[in-house]
A protein has these predicted regions:
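Positively charged, small/polar-rich N-terminal and surface patches that mediate targeting and assembly
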Residues: 1-212
Length: 212
C-alpha cells in the first residue's frame, strides 16, 4: 500500500480559539498518531483574498506569510487526519498526493524525491544527514537538489520542536528535494533510507519539462 503526502497551506496569523491554527494542526497530527510533520514558512505568497504578502517586517509573524505543513501518511491515517485537520482550516488549502507504486515505474520518466529529516548541531565536526544526502545525490548525477529549513515539526521522537519557542534548537526539521530519472530510481530510496538516520523518504511521479 502506498504512502500519501498531505500538504496544508494557510496564513500564519490564522487562529482557532485564540490559538495559532498552524500549531493546532501540528498538535492534531501528533494526537492522531502521525509519525512526523514539518512546518515551513514561505518568503512571500498570495492569500485567500488575493493579497500578496511579503517578508518585510523583522518579526516574521506580522508579515502573515503562508505556512506550509507537510506530512507523509499511511492509507489508514488519511481519513482520520483529514477529519481532524479540515475543521481547523477556515481559509487555506489541503492537498493529498499518492506515493510511488511499482505500477508507476514504466508509466513515468521522472520522480520527485522528498526527504524529511532534521539537523543535529550536537554532531560536532560530523556531516549532517542532509550533507550526506546531497553528496549521495551528486554521485547519482542529480542537479537542482534543494534543502529548506522548517520552523517547527516533529519526528519519530514525537517531540514538537519549534523555532519560535526554541530559536537555538538543534533538531529543526529539514526537507531535501530533487527529481530523479526513472533509470536512476531502482534502489535509490533504499540507499537513502540507510543514509537518513532519522526521517522519511517520499517518492511520487512528476512531469519534468525542463532540467538544465
Amino acid at each position: 500500500m502506498p504512502d500519501y503526502l498531505m500538504r496544508i497551506i494557510l496564513n500564519e496569523q490564522q487562529h482557532e480559539k485564540k490559538k495559532q491554527t498552524s500549531r493546532e494542526i501540528l498538535t492534531c497530527m501528533w494526537e492522531q498518531g502521525v509519525p512526523g510533520a514539518t512546518m515551513r514558512r514561505g518568503n512571500a505568497g498570495i492569500d485567500n483574498e488575493d493579497h500578496i504578502e511579503y517578508d518585510i517586517l523583522e518579526d516574521a509573524y506580522y508579515n502573515n506569510l503562508p505556512i506550509i505543513i507537510e506530512s507523509v501518511l499511511s492509507g489508514d491515517l488519511i481519513k482520520k487526519v483529514e477529519g481532524c485537520v479540515k475543521p481547523l482550516v477556515k481559509h487555506g488549502q489541503i492537498s493529498i498526493s499518492k506515493g510511488f507504486e511499482e505500477t508507476d515505474f514504466l508509466k513515468h520518466e521522472h520522480f520527485i524525491v522528498k526527504v524529511y529529516t532534521s539537523e543535529n548541531k550536537k554532531k560536532l565536526l560530523k556531516k549532517e544527514d542532509y550533507e550526506k544526502i546531497l553528496t549521495f545525490l551528486q554521485k547519482k548525477n542529480v542537479i537542482w537538489a534543494t534543502v529548506t529549513k522548517g520552523i517547527a515539526g516533529y519526528g519519530r521522537d514525537h517531540v514538537i520542536y519549534s523555532q519560535h519557542l526554541f530559536p537555538l534548537s538543534e533538531h529543526m526539521p529539514l526537507v531535501v528535494e530533487c527529481i530523479i530519472a526513472r533509470d536512476d530510481l531502482p534502489g535509490l530510496t533504499e540507499e537513502l533510507n540507510q543514509i537518513v538516520t532519522g526521517g522519511i523518504v517520499f517518492t511520487t511521479p512528476v512531469d519534468l519539462i525542463l532540467n538544465r
